[in-house]
Regions:
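Glycine-rich FAD pyrophosphate-binding loop
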Residues: 1-19
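Hydrophobic anchor at the start of a short beta-strand
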Residues: 3, 87, 274
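Dinucleotide-binding Rossmann-like beta1-alpha1 core, especially the glycine-rich loop
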Residues: 21-98, 224, 366-373, 489
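Flavin (FAD/FMN) cofactor-binding and adjacent substrate-gating region
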Residues: 63-139, 145-152, 230, 289-302, ...
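Short beta-strand segments that buttress and anchor functional surface loops
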Residues: 112-113, 156-160
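C-terminal catalytic lobe of FAD-dependent flavoproteins
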Residues: 119-121, 129, 187, 192-201, ...
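Core beta-strand elements of the Rossmann-like FAD/NAD(P) dinucleotide-binding domain
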Residues: 162-173, 177
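Low-complexity, small/polar and acidic-rich linker and loop segments
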Residues: 458-512
Length: 512
């Protein structure tokens, strides 16, 4: 198959990069959504094999607090086992031994195979793998219309926001995989996909207070999952319906911050005294059924729509719903339908084929085999790129010098990302390397990274404007939680960039 991916902005700019980073066991949905639970545990086991450098096998606890119904625990365990999910009731003392940060007042605990998954290297690995197999990927290309001949879609028109020009692409099949924006894309073809924009807000804390995922043992509700992710931890999420015209301009509200802090501290009381780095939100691409436009009974399951049989529109398919955990299965379903329509008899092999970076040993073995005594910077690079770290120059003093001290990002890694990972600006670079994602939120590293981009693109003015945009983007996440240390940090950043560097104003950040 000859394939082309068009991305409106950068990779992971939508819900893919705005989620919990949870390697779902499916336990959360076992009671309320058995189908989604089964899909999650199936994909959980697959990702542990094919994306080892992108996941951390932490395991998870579902804890019952005094205010919760302990009787729900048996229903929960039975539902997990029915879905094929390992779920073991353990003594509260054992739970606290395994995870000391959990609420000491817990009265019940269940251990499940949850984990942590980083959506940024996972997405990059998938895209790189597709390119190795002949796919073409164009970021910053927004689809503006679909080309139709009679009742058949034969291509798309897109606007290249980098080159500022319109482009036309023709194909035998067009796949609508636009997430929450899939509603609009479907309408361009004259089809209807009833999307239900469900906003979810999350908070990122300055360090990991927990090493296991901590869930609340109850039906899904606000702020009942605490996930350890890389150097930080995340509490979330909320859930509220968002007007469709606001999906590109989300703001985390004070009420959402209050809920996340209040409920999060019930899972791990230490959160109440832990610094918050930023707040962010994403929109779940939920699909209301044709007979339930209100969305009251929405599953997290996968929705694959053949618009030829559903709407009489040939050459057009939509794949939506689902979640990050089931992305591979979504792609398999869509690809199987594509092959059926195009007369291709090959079977999907992605469930058994390791992604680039995960072909060899685990990340610890890669580190020790690449360097006899790997340092923190080298280990961090392996954690982000897996075995592809062998393509990153870290052998000399200059290349191994740090750009981002918080996240141990070196000059060599930044240059590799610019040269090999389709980096156009600092926000792209952040998603490829974690530059600016640490405690200082780009305060000290953004200008260094901008300098490297200026050299690579041979355009200082472009780098300056990019720096302004990046600082603005970081500020948007700090603003909702700007008190205490975060307020002091933001003031210090203001002094550095405005007072010392003379940086003023700036364009709106690309991610809104």
């Amino acid at each position: 198959l000859k394939t082309l991916l068009l991305e409106r902005l950068d990779l992971t700019a939508g819900a893919t990069g705005r989620n919990h980073g949870l390697l779902h066991s499916g336990a959360r949905y076992a009671v309320t959504d058995q189908e989604s639970a089964e899909e999650c545990i199936q994909e959980n086991m697959i990702l542990r094999k094919i994306a080892r450098h992108c996941v951390e096998e932490t395991d998870g606890l579902f804890i019952t607090l005094p205010e919760d119904d302990l009787g729900f625990q048996s229903t929960f365990i039975d539902s997990c086992l029915k879905a094929g999910i390992r779920a073991e009731a353990i003594d509260p003392k054992e739970a606290l031994r395994l995870e000391p940060s959990a609420n000491k007042d817990l009265i019940g605990a269940v251990r499940v195979p949850d984990g942590a998954g980083d959506p940024f290297p996972l997405t990059v690995a998938n895209v790189y793998d597709a390119q190795l197999h002949g796919a073409e990927v164009l970021t910053y290309h927004q689809v503006t219309s679909l080309i139709k001949e009679g009742d058949r879609v034969v291509g798309v028109e897109a606007y290249d926001t980098q080159a500022r020009q319109k482009k036309t692409f023709r194909s035998r099949l067009v796949i609508n995989a636009g997430g929450i924006w899939g509603h609009h894309i479907a309408s361009l073809a004259g089809a209807t996909v009833n999307m239900f924009p469900a906003k979810g807000a999350l908070l990122i804390f300055g360090h990991r207070v927990n090493n296991m995922v901590i869930n609340r043992c109850r039906k899904p509700a606000d702020a009942d999952i605490l996930v350890p992710g890389d150097t930080i931890c995340l509490i979330g999420t909320t859930s509220s319906r968002l007007p469709y015209d606001q999906i590109d301009d989300m703001k985390v509200t004070p009420e959402e911050v209050d809920i996340l802090l209040k409920e999060g501290a019930k899972l791990a009381p230490e959160l109440a005294d832990t610094r918050i780095l930023r707040a962010y939100a994403g929109v779940r691409p939920l699909v209301a059924t044709d007979d339930d436009p209100s969305g009251r009974n929405i599953s997290r399951g996968i929705v694959l729509l053949d618009h030829e049989t559903r709407d009489g529109v040939k050459g057009f398919i939509s794949i939506t719903g689902g979640k990050l955990m089931t992305y591979r299965l979504m792609a398999e379903w869509a690809a199987d339908l594509v092959c059926k329509k195009l007369g291709v008899s090959q079977s999907c092999i992605t469930m058994d084929t390791p992604l680039p970076g995960s072909e060899k040993e685990n990340i610890d073995e890669i580190s020790t085999k690449t360097w006899s005594k790997p340092n923190a910077t080298q280990k961090a690079s392996v954690g982000r790129h897996g075995s592809r770290v062998e393509n990153i120059k870290l052998s000399d003093e200059y290349s191994s010098s740090l750009v981002c001290e918080c996240e141990e990002v070196s000059i060599g890694e930044v240059k590799y990302a610019i040269d090999e990972l389709d980096v156009h600006n600092l926000v792209d670079l952040r998603r490829r390397t974690r530059v600016g994602m640490g405690t200082c939120q780009g305060e000290l590293c953004a200008c260094r990274a901008a300098g490297l981009l200026a050299d690579a693109h041979q355009c200082t003015d472009r780098a300056k404007n990019d720096l302004k945009s990046f600082v603005n983007e970081r500020w948007k996440g700090m603003y909702p939680i700007c008190w205490g240390d975060t307020l002091r940090e933001s003031e210090y950043s203001q002094w550095i960039y405005s007072g010392v560097c003379g940086l003023e104003g700036g364009e709106e950040c690309e991610t809104k």
